Amino acid sequence: MQLANRMQTLSESITIAISTKAKEMKAAGIDVISLSAGEPDFMTPKKIRETVKNALDNDSKSGKYTPVPGLPEVIEAIRAKLKRDNGLDYKANQIVTNIGAKHSLFNVFQALINPGDEVIIPSPYWVSYPEIVKFCGGVPVFIEADESTNFKVTAEQLKKAITPKTKVFSLNHPTNPTGAVYTKDEIAAFGEVLKGTDIIVTSDEIYEKVIYGKKFHAVASVSEDLFKRTVTINGLSKCGAMPGWRFGYIASSMDWLIAGIKKLQSQSTSNISSIVQIGAIPSLLGETDEDIENMRKEYEKRRDVAVEIINAIPGLSVVKPDGAFYLFVKCKDVDSDSLRFCKKMLEEANVATVPGVGFGMEGYFRISFATDIESIKRAIERIANFVKSYKI
């Protein structure tokens, strides 16, 4: 007996593996500080909690099946959000809710990718992108960014990576793990490269409201051509402090693709939790915007403190991110083997971080500042002492 061949292409999520190890160490009584998981430490906004409590007691729809794409009122709330925040006008039948944005991406690639199709992925990348592509039979093609461009790839790099087999350009903006945010002109340049092709853009915009001193531009909003070829993917896990609720969604003007995704979801998960859908409505309608902005301000304070302390540690350096809640820290001068470095850090300094190799780039590690400022300071102090006495 054995697993299907397609399972041989799939690797365990390194972020989840490290987070799990850190929790096991904590359970064993070890004082571990985890900066590994991209999980907001804030409580889900009160308005959302109250909405769900009320629905459980008074709404006959709570706990019932819903249409596969989602409740009509949830779809309308997503439409309103996309129009209000991003200037995007989608029809109700062009939106599908999913069990988090990871499920959204999985559905999109399952519906699009044939064996051998190439998907262009900027590197560093979120750990699950290439794994999902490979599982669907596709071939990840990486274009690498570095500190010289603030970890942003260029239109020229995209142009050089395109082949007759290219099916998708997969963009994450703001980016995990680097926090890179693309400008309107940079996105427009991607659009110019893609004109005249059948290449589809997937734009994962899950961190859109965790942004510092920049203006966010949804990819599909930049030009009519990009609107026609882009699948917008978003959710409430990061910006809305609802990671465990698992609420994501897909929006696209490509009716044939949305129809295919609905068909796929009807034979897999069907609808997402009715309670989660009801709870998402206040956030989608902008009723928790004040909470989201307060969280963003706190993230910004944490970012500034963490960047200053890390850049004072000999052997380490970090580019200040414009978005998300991660720092992608360079450790090449200490150890270019990021997996070894992070493993020793966890075992010897009791600080959990994620090795850069999981994001496609050696000599770096990622820390999340989605935790309280005192824990961040204590963790970085441990990292500094660890680096000072580090031996390969």
What are these regions (language model features)?
Residues 3, 7-13, 18, 23-31, ...:
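PLP-dependent class I/II
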